[in-house]
């Protein structure tokens, strides 16, 4: 029985009031009647539709979102579509067509997002046992106002700890994580009244007990911010951005008190049209975000109700990671550093009763980069600042990654020779490659995905170039190295259908040596195999496994830290142990390695091996320690006390500081003049600047100019000594001042810092030659490398004695009669160990053995003294001793053999909190009594007390003393390696490339700091880079690169040509650009314009922060009432057209076509009289009237906005005028003025010369005399 109009309205009213949910499709006529009912019902009518803001507690403070967006008068009757009415029936109010929310497209740039924690490091990015090393203070990869990857409204948020089990989560933490298993936009826009319903629902249905089994690994419980909350709020502030292309807000859901998360997800899918599939979501069946929480498995468990996480049952006996620092003995010890007694409590020592093989463990579930496998978007990774400044920062980041930002490396050119043949394409390749390096330097705690790398492109036609640069940077170890975790989203190829369970084969890579080179090699190989896992699965084999064979019971090699003892020992006990003990005393306090699992629990530690880091020689390690691992590295600041043995006095501290500045300038200048690839203009500029510096520092210099022609003919060290002689004679330096410079030369050579500072633009930082020390010891670096994100498979006490390579296998024989059969071998031990103790079959090539023989290792002897209290002056960084041998060497006298055996003694009190002095023994200046350890300690102690004791403090009680020697054993050759063939400048031009820091000999690979050790970085960083470089040959042999030739296809080539024409890059002339920058006037104008642009940008940002964004003009309404009638009556007319066609054809299943429906619409419209058309005409008139009101309001708001913005701009401009001009701009201004004066002077001189020349050419013959009276004939 058909229902009348009033019956349909009653039904609609019933469904609206009860908020019932429909699973079946409603009849179109019912939808139409609901629309009319919604139109004729007042907004504030309690029996009408449910408005979303009315469900909040303060429903009088906010107007209807629909009314604000579509109507000025809230009491005006509303015409809505059938879809809007259906959404109202399903439980939500009338939603705005253009919602006030963030853009939910996965890779649409959202520069207005206020969620500052989107790209910051999540809690779970570090192991839960390494809590105090969570670098939450680090800046995110993108600024707080720029977040390129906006995924729903909770992308890349850390997984809440309280959902995994019982925890003491606070109220803020509990309320911030109620969206697990719910649509993101629904969870982030809950009204307060309904939010409590969901909180009760989740309290009653704990996800930790139902959805997630107990075997899921726990996350870190450390707070993500200083507020103490265990989670980050989804929105840190109000969202002001309105995007018309954003995915619309979904309606408010039904009451969830009796619904499970799967039912909520099903309801969520029913409410969303299947025709719209944002790229944020995984597939057509699931509308859950790809990274709803940190772990990918969690989103799969919510989506599919299955948790495919393998059980994490721990093995019975597992060798612990190198997480414990051994306690230093309270007794003064001597003897060899590698003595067995000394290694009993070393770092990473294996506990008693454990087996030597460490089984592999399940990979920890670290948070991965959000949405790295979705569709890329051009410009998504570029910040909102100007491209010019961004490319400058990108070029600087490339230098920090050991890349020339404007040239291809030799191995890069070999790899890409067939693909980068066009200079214009090469120009864009450099910009893209440098920008990817900027992403890595900005935040190395997250691995860079291919999609994120493609986001640095300004146009999508450059995506192939980004893939090319990304492939090169990943394979050669310039990015994505260290303690990183990779999931399936980082695989470089598409999945071929092969899974790890169906694969049957697996290769093995063995790394011999667990020093820094071996550990970073194993960790990098593990990461590369994870990123290229699909390449192995496509061949029906598992990614290769990596094992490490270590000869000793600890890891770290020459990185060796020991915890300082707490107890104090008397002086009598010290003398007794010093004279009678050659090992650690049994009476000293010991620390069980099992009890210490976190280096942060160690109060203080001292390094017996590598200790100091210097910039820029160790920039890569410093970036890894500071930004990725969160290891605190402090600079050793303070003054230096220097004692001259010849003059028997302590030099003036002001004079020492002045000479230290001179030494730094000498090192910078020689670095510029030494490299043959430095442009002549840059060299001339540095010569003039250095000459000006010397003239200002030493006014009594000679009148002649400083000549440095010898720097082009000798090695770096020889050039430095020649420069010291010339500067000393030119500046009239005294004998003590020259000895100080030579002493600086000797100290730099001993500290392994005497290398040319190889930078392209000679941009020397102010903190060069300032030593940096890792608090709690440098052994935290190898401890982290072998422990995170999953422990490496290390086999201890495996002394390899023979390596046999036959056919496709490599056999490793150990001294304990054990044998390993692997596919490839990496030798990462010391050169003397594998050249003397390891037999190779077949033998090593001649060029390898010759290179090893050319390396000279310094012994690395070190003395450490611990006192009861500091007896020296405060704020003293080091104590220097200028020996008599320097004076004898300067005067060409014979050495009497009584010179001091130390050059510098470091004060470690500010870094360790314990009065400790560390001295490196100079192997070239040893006294006659230095062979005996006890005499060495007593002599050094007496020297310090006699020359550097403060008069106000007479107490100098020595508690402990340790002496280490890294050359008196068969495993280590010494501490630092030095080349014997370092006189060739061409060797320094290699810029310590990764590919030239290892040998790839088929299945045998050799890595270490002794390979091409003449490059410009210290031994420690060379060891690190060598371990990275050896992985390139391995991954290339196992997973070859797959790139198309040419790299840019025909279609992309056309798009690129059009893009280049639009951007006018074809007219780029590097020579003209270089000539333009040579002028100081042009450089000053650019610098000034850059400052003005920066002020303008800050000005606009200030206006935006204070006033928000400029109001958007209202959309113009439709002026044709028939179109409104057609939209609202489509379903009715289609039903009428269907009935007419069935009546004409006699077919009960006949359907009318679109044209027939349109004809029916036109016919019914024409049949309406004026009264029937009046509602539609009135609605159009009302919309026009509302539009007129909106226009007036928009004009008023715009005028007010512009007036206030102009006032803010004027105030900010007045403030900027009062600020002083930056020093670099003022310097350029002075140089530009001087250049202009010189130009004018030159111009005047040329004019004067031309006048003089014209006067000489002019001769007066009297013909122009006015008194001449000619006779006319």
Curated annotation (Swiss-Prot):
Biased composition (Basic and acidic residues): 1233-1253
The SWIRM domain, residue ranges: 394-490
Example of a GO cellular component annotation carried by this entry: Lsd1/2 complex
DNA-binding segment(s): 1115-1195
Stretch list, region Disordered: 199-237, 571-596, 1215-1273
Biased composition, class Low complexity, residue ranges: 574-590
GO biological process: chromatin remodeling; facultative heterochromatin formation; heterochromatin boundary formation; mating-type locus imprinting; pericentric heterochromatin formation; positive regulation of DNA-templated transcription; silent mating-type cassette heterochromatin formation; subtelomeric heterochromatin formation
Annotated keywords: Chromatin regulator, Coiled coil, DNA-binding, FAD, Flavoprotein, Nucleus, Oxidoreductase, Repressor, Transcription, Transcription regulation
Signal peptide, first to last residue: none
Any one Gene Ontology molecular-function term assigned to this protein's record: oxidoreductase activity
Main location: nucleus
Cofactor(s) required for function per UniProt: FAD
Keyword Membrane: no
Coiled coil: 247-307, 681-767
Localisation: Nucleus
Oligomer status and interactors: Component of the SWM histone demethylase complex composed of at least lsd1, lsd2, phf1 and phf2. Interacts directly with lsd1.
Homology family: Belongs to the flavin monoamine oxidase family.
Name of the featured protein: Lysine-specific histone demethylase 2
């Amino acid at each position: 029985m058909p229902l009348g109009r009033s019956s349909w309205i009653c039904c609609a009213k019933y469904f609206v009031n009860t908020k019932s949910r429909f699973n079946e499709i409603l009849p179109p006529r019912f939808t139409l009647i609901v629309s009319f009912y919604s139109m004729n019902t007042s907004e504030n009518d309690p029996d009408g539709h449910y408005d979303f803001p009315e469900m909040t507690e303060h429903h009088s403070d906010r107007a209807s979102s629909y009314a604000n967006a579509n109507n000025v008068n809230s009491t005006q009757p509303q015409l809505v579509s059938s879809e809007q009415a259906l959404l109202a029936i399903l439980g939500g109010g009338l939603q705005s067509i253009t919602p006030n929310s963030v853009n939910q497209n996965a890779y649409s740039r959202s520069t207005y997002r206020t969620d500052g924690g989107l790209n910051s490091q999540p809690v779970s990015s570090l192991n839960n046992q390494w809590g105090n090393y969570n670098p939450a203070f680090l800046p995110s990869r993108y600024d707080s106002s720029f977040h390129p990857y906006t995924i729903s409204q909770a992308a890349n948020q850390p997984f809440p700890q309280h959902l995994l089990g019982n925890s003491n989560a606070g109220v803020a933490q509990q309320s911030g994580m109620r969206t697990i298993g719910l649509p993101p936009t629904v969870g982030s826009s809950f009204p307060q009244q309904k939010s409590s319903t969901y909180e009760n629902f989740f309290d009653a249905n704990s996800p930790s007990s139902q959805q997630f089994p107990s075997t899921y690994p726990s996350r870190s419980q450390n707070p993500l911010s200083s507020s103490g909350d265990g989670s980050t709020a989804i929105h840190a502030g109000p969202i002001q951005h309105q995007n018309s292309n954003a995915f619309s807000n979904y309606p408010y859901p039904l009451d969830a008190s009796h619904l499970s998360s799967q039912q909520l997800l099903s309801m969520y899918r029913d409410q969303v049209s299947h025709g719209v599939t944002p790229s944020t979501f995984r597939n057509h069946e699931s509308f859950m975000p790809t990274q709803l929480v940190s772990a990918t498995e969690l989103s799969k468990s919510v989506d599919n109700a299955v948790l495919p996480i393998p059980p994490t049952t721990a093995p019975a006996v597992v060798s612990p990671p190198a997480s414990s620092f051994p306690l230093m003995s309270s007794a003064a010890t001597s003897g060899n550093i590698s003595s067995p007694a000394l290694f009993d409590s070393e770092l990473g020592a294996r506990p008693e009763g454990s087996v030597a093989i460490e089984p592999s463990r399940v990979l920890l579930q670290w948070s991965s980069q959000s949405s790295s496998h979705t569709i890329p978007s051009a410009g998504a990774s570029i910040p909102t600042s100007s491209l010019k400044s961004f490319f400058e920062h990108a070029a600087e980041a490339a230098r920090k990654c050991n890349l020339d930002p404007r040239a291809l490396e030799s191995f890069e050119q070999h790899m890409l020779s067939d693909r980068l043949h066009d200079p214009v394409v090469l120009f864009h390749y450099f910009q893209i490659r440098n920008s990817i390096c900027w992403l890595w330097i900005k935040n190395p705690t997250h691995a860079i995905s291919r999609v994120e790398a493609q986001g640095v492109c300004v146009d999508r036609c450059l995506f192939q170039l980004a893939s090319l640069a990304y492939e090169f940077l990943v394979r050669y170890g310039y990015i994505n190295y260290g303690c990183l975790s990779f999931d399936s989203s980082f695989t470089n190829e598409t999945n071929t259908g092969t899974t790890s369970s169906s694969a049957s084969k697996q290769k093995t890579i063995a790394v011999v040596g667990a020093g820094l080179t071996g550990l970073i090699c194993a960790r990098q190989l593990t990461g590369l195999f994870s990123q290229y896992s699909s390449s192995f699965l496509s061949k029906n084999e598992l990614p290769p496994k990596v094992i490490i064979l270590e000869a000793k019971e600890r890891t770290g090699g020459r990185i060796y830290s020991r915890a300082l003892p707490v107890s104090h020992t008397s002086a009598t006990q010290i003398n007794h142990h010093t004279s009678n003990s050659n090992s650690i005393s049994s009476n000293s306090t010991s620390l069980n390695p099992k009890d210490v699992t976190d280096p942060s629990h160690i109060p203080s530690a001292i390094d017996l091996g590598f200790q100091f880091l210097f910039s820029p020689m160790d920039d890569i390690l410093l970036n890894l320690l500071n930004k990725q691992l969160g290891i605190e590295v402090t600079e050793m600041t303070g003054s230096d006390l220097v004692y001259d043995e010849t003059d028997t006095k302590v030099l003036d501290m002001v004079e020492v500081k002045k000479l230290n500045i001179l030494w730094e300038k000498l090192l910078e200048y020689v670095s510029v003049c030494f490299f043959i690839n430095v442009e002549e203009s840059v060299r001339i500029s540095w010569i003039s600047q250095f000459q000006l510096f010397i003239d200002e520092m030493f006014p009594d210099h000679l009148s002649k100019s400083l000549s440095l022609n010898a720097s082009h003919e000798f090695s770096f060290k020889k050039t430095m000594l020649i420069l010291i002689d010339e500067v000393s004679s030119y500046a009239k330096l005294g004998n003590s001042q020259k000895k100080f410079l030579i002493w600086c030369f000797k100290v730099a050579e001993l500290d392994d810092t005497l290398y040319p500072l190889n930078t392209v633009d000679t941009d020397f930082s102010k903190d060069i030659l300032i030593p940096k020390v890792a608090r709690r010891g440098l052994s935290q670096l190898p401890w982290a490398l072998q422990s995170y994100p999953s422990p490496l498979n290390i086999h201890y006490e495996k002394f390899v004695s023979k390596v046999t390579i036959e056919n496709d296998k490599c056999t490793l024989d150990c001294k304990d009669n054990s044998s390993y059969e692997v596919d490839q071998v990496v030798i990462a031990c010391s050169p003397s160990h594998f050249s003397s103790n390891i037999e190779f079959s077949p033998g090593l090539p001649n060029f390898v053995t010759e290179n090893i023989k050319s390396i000279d290792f310094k012994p690395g002897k070190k003395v450490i003294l611990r006192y009861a209290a500091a007896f020296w002056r405060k704020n003293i960084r080091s104590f220097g001793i200028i020996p008599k041998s320097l004076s004898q060497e300067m005067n060409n006298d014979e050495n009497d053999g009584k010179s001091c055996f130390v050059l510098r003694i470091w004060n470690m009190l500010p870094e360790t909190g314990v009065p400790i002095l560390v001295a490196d023994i100079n192997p070239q200046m040893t006294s006659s009594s230095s062979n005996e350890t006890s005499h060495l300690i007593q002599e050094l102690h007496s020297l310090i007390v006699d020359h550097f004791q403060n008069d106000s403090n007479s107490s100098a009680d020595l508690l402990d003393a340790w002496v280490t020697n890294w050359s008196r054993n068969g495993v280590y050759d010494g501490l630092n390696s030095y080349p014997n063939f370092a006189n060739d400048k061409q060797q320094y031009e290699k810029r310590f490339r990764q590919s030239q820091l290892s040998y790839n000999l088929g299945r045998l690979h050799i890595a270490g700091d002794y390979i091409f050790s003449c490059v410009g970085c210290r031994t420690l960083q060379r060891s690190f880079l060598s371990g990275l470089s050896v992985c390139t040959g391995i991954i290339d042999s196992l997973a070859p690169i797959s790139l198309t030739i040419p790299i840019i296809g025909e279609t992309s080539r056309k798009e690129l040509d059009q893009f280049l024409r639009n951007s006018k890059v074809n007219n780029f002339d590097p020579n003209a650009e270089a000539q333009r920058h040579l002028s100081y006037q042009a450089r000053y104008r650019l610098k000034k314009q850059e400052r003005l642009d920066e002020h303008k940008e800050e000005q606009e940002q200030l206006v935006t922060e204070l006033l928000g964004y400029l109001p958007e003009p209202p959309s113009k309404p439709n002026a044709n009432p028939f179109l409104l009638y057609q939209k609202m009556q489509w379903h009715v007319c289609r039903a009428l057209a269907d009935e007419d066609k069935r009546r004409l054809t006699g077919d009960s299943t006949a359907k009318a076509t679109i044209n027939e429906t349109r004809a029916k619409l036109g016919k019914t419209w024409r049949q309406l009289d004026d009264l029937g058309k009046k509602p539609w005409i009135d609605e159009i008139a009302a919309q026009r009237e509302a539009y007129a009101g909106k226009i007036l309001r928009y004009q008023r708001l715009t005028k007010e906005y512009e007036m206030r913005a102009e006032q803010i701009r004027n105030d900010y401009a007045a403030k900027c005028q009062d600020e002083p001009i930056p020093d670099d701009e003022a310097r350029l201004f002075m140089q530009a003025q001087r250049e202009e004066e010189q130009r004018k002077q030159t111009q005047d001189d040329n004019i004067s010369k031309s006048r003089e020349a014209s006067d000489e050419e002019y001769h007066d013959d009297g013909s122009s005399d006015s008194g001449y009276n000619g006779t006319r004939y």
